């Protein structure tokens, strides 16, 4: 009887990390974080009823009646104690859509297809950033802390690319009103497919939705010392920590709000080699 009990417990333990991922919130009441099975909907554009007359005139002048607000969020968390090659920083990246700054006028829900493409462009940026960080880590022989050190520099370069692509799309499709939407959709889809291995995970979204580190024994990094070898008297790395902005109340796939998700054990590190 005992061996069956041990077997059942072993199966439960092996499955628990995968099952826990179903509990990760991928949005809040304020933000939607990019996921392949979560397209934007009219309900996500929550500023529609609170636009000023000036904003409405600007939208009418350019015939832009569906406008989303997007961002590319990043956060690095690090062990509070000793770092090793397998216990090092964890970088989270997620495209974010801000509900209360996005609007639809005159019932132009058809415009959501354009905003979804712009949201997908943010996901292209997220994947390119992960790819670049991974390449740098390989070149540095997987040195602990290297991704956190170069994160902001790499993000700035990716940000330039995404902004340029987004501006070109808006100019061609939304301002000039030409027929290049299909070409743009194909271009973005090609990027998403090419970098499919670097897609935004539910863990990335949950890091921002829950607004705290997901791993036990980890804390948020605001900035690292330029010389990463610098340590305090106890031998641990010196990390400057700072508060993270309010991201709202987590919304779970089962419709519940604010349900607690316990931190993972560092043994189940999602970046484990």
Question: Which role does the model predict for each range below?
Answer:
Residues 21-106, 119, 127-273:
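Extended, composition-driven regions rather than compact fold-specific motifs
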Residues 7, 111, 125-127:
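A structural preference for long, well-packed, hydrophobic secondary-structure segments
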Residues 1-24:
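Bacterial Sec-dependent N-terminal signal peptides
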Residues 110-122:
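Active-site recognition of the HExxH zinc-binding catalytic motif
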